From Swiss-Prot:
Organism classification: Eukaryota, Metazoa, Chordata, Craniata, Vertebrata
Membrane topology listed for this record: Multi-pass membrane protein
Source species of the chain: Homo sapiens (Human)
Signal peptide feature range: none
Residue positions the entry lists as glycosylated: N216, N232, N239
Protein name, per record: Excitatory amino acid transporter 4
InterPro entries in UniProt: DAACS, Na-dicarboxylate_symporter, Na-dicarboxylate_symporter_CS, Na:dicarbo_symporter_sf
Domain notes per entry: Contains eight transmembrane regions plus two helical hairpins that dip into the membrane. These helical hairpin structures play an important role in the transport process. The first enters the membrane from the cytoplasmic side, the second one from the extracellular side. During the transport cycle, the regions involved in amino acid transport, and especially the helical hairpins, move vertically by about 15-18 Angstroms, alternating between exposure to the aqueous phase and reinsertion in the lipid bilayer. In contrast, the regions involved in trimerization do not move.
TM stretches of this protein: 56-76, 99-119, 133-153, 262-285, 295-322, 344-365, 411-437, 498-519
Lineage: superkingdom: Eukaryota
Intramembrane annotation, residue ranges: 371-401, 451-484
One protein family per Pfam: SDF
């Protein structure tokens, strides 16, 4: 077929799009895409291949690192390395985690302050409402999928006697856990919030109470005859003797009481609340807040340039992180049997949410193909799998969305830090599913009210799960306590949590990224008004000019892709 015939075919099929049904339009769109792909392959040259490799170098290196890391780990497992040797082997991966965590604190503060300051209160309120609705809807859907999967597959049938326990889980009263969540939203010391979180500790104290009893068993305080009574003929000495017969018994017992305490780690929730409020105040100061806006915008730009340097080391770190985790696992057989069914259930649930629900939401809102978008997030997703922390992945997520996919920086600066802190779809799904699995292995039948309680508690607890490794295990105590399930049974699933934690972190990061794209699409009107009215300096340049440059760069990248 000649190029003229190909063009004629494309033009005629385009005219028919308005007359045929959506199914036929989809079929013709796929045919056009296949034809364009065939034409690109026919005209491909070595220069095109090199350009593709340069443009996708990060992704190719990261995927290769995962494959090499898994292969290397299984090749070294027969040598049975000691724990010390494994730690030495994993050291390059530890360095990557430390580099990324180093950037999280200034990135959260600078991006949120700049994002809030660049929008007026009305626009911020609308975007915040859209973000809250998106977070709530996706989290509820994730919890529903988790409950549905564990109910259908029923991985907990059988007995828990065959399951191996690992570690210990600290029991935390539900009320104290939620109060700690609220306390952490308002840290009394911002400097301390950079490295500590409030956490209720528990101590025991001895309580002593006096119990008064009488020899004849009468109640304390019962009426006694006066010291001397002529009527009953008793003497003063006799009455004193009777009074001495009253016994005082001292009872002592231990009582557990909550006391203020702390835990190491960034109080991300408190910093998010402060940064949002501080950014809104700076935005309301108009011209007077210009210096502060310049400062935080320059800080954000400097952090992103550091990310651009560290990102080249990411494939090496991911390789050793994944290989080290596989080497640490003593018995790979725990992935089979009853825990194997549990693992499969979690994987199926996460796949349904991340592979079907989130892309469907993206398609319904934006009317665009979600899979090229997910492909653009591939490096952030692989980094999430390697680091097992949505907060540590945040710098890479910013880079993928802003530079790779061209999402508006005013949206990413607002949505991503908040999402990495409170939007945990994968964690919510996992907690609901794991709670019902523990009920199943205990042969405990849950009624509709208890399942509803698990749904609500898992949704709320996922907000309190900071973006740190295995935080879901801690918040799951809240879910189990809410329906009276034994919290010590969490140790039954710790053996596979290192693997599932990586998958749910990938789901969390994808949910935040799609949320940014969805909110950007819904907020186009507010963004255009802000672009016309507001000038936000960025390294001495007007924000409007910066946005124009970014759009031009995005069009340039799109042109290069079409050339392929």
């Amino acid at each position: 077929m000649s190029s003229h015939g190909n063009s004629l075919f494309l033009r005629e099929s385009g005219q028919r799009l308005g007359r045929v049904g959506w199914l036929q339009r989809l079929q013709e769109s796929l045919q056009q895409r296949a034809l364009r792909t065939r034409l690109r392959l026919q005209t491909m040259t070595l220069e095109h291949v090199l350009r593709f490799l340069r443009r996708n170098a990060f992704i190719l290196l990261t995927v290769s690192a995962v494959v090499i890391g898994v292969s290397l780990a299984f090749a070294l497992r027969p040598y049975q390395l000691t724990y010390r040797q494994i730690k030495y082997f994993s050291f390059p991966g530890e360095l990557l985690m430390r580099m990324l965590q180093m950037l999280v604190l200034p990135l959260i503060v600078s991006s949120l302050v700049t994002g809030m300051a660049s929008l007026d209160n009305k626009a911020t309120g609308r975007m915040g409402m859209r973000a809250a609705v998106y977070y709530m809807v996706t989290t509820i859907i994730a919890v529903f999928i988790g409950i549905l999967m564990v109910t259908i597959i029923h991985p907990g049938k059988g007995s828990k006697e065959g399951l191996h326990r690992e570690g210990r889980i600290e029991t935390i009263p539900t009320a104290d856990a939620f109060m700690d969540l609220i306390r952490n939203m308002f840290p009394p010391n911002l400097v301390e919030a950079c490295f500590k979180q409030f956490k209720t500790q528990y101590s025991t104290r001895v309580v002593t109470r006096t119990m008064v009893r009488t020899e004849n068993g009468s109640e304390p305080g019962a009426s006694m005859p006066p010291p001397f009574s002529v009527e009953n003929g008793t003497s003063f000495l006799e009455n004193v003797t009777r009074a001495l017969g009253t016994l005082q018994e001292m009872l002592s017992f231990e009582e557990t009481v909550p006391v203020p305490g702390s835990a190491n780690g960034i109080n991300a929730l408190g910093l998010v609340v402060f940064s949002v409020a501080f950014g809104l105040v700076i935005g309301g100061m108009k011209h007077k807040g210009r210096v502060l806006r310049d400062f935080f915008d320059s800080l954000n730009e400097a952090i992103m340039r550091l990310v651009g340097i560290i990102i080249w080391y990411a494939p090496v770190g991911i390789l050793f992180l994944i290989a080290g985790k596989i080497l640490e696992m003593e018995d790979m057989a725990v992935l089979g049997g009853q825990l194997g069914m549990y693992t499969l259930t979690v994987i199926v649930g996460l796949f349904l949410h991340a592979g079907i629900v989130l892309p469907l939401i993206y398609f319904l809102v934006t009317h665009r193909n979600p899979f090229p978008f997910i492909g653009g997030m591939l490096q952030a997703l692989i980094t999430a799998m390697g680091t097992s922390s949505s907060s540590a992945t945040l710098p890479i997520t910013f880079r993928c969305l802003e530079e790779g996919l061209g999402v508006d920086r005013r949206i990413t600066r607002f949505v991503l830090p908040v999402g990495a802190t409170v939007n945990m779809d994968g964690t919510a799904l996992y907690e609901a599913l794991a709670a019902i699995f523990i009920a199943q292995v205990n042969n405990y039948e849950l009624n509709l009210g208890q399942i509803t309680t698990i749904s609500i508690t898992a949704t709320a607890a996922s907000v309190g799960a900071a973006g740190i490794p295995q935080a879901g295990l801690v918040t799951m105590v809240i879910v189990l306590t809410s329906v009276g399930l034994p919290t010590e049974d969490i140790t039954l699933i710790i053996a596979v949590d290192w693997f599932l934690d990586r998958l749910r972190t990938m789901t969390n990061v994808l949910g935040d990224s799609i949320g940014a794209a969805v909110i950007e699409h819904l907020s186009q009107r507010e963004l255009e008004l802000q672009e016309a009215e507001l000038t936000l300096p960025s390294l001495g340049k007007p924000y409007k000019s910066l946005m124009a440059q970014e759009k031009g760069a995005s069009r340039g990248r799109g042109g290069n892709e079409s050339a392929m």
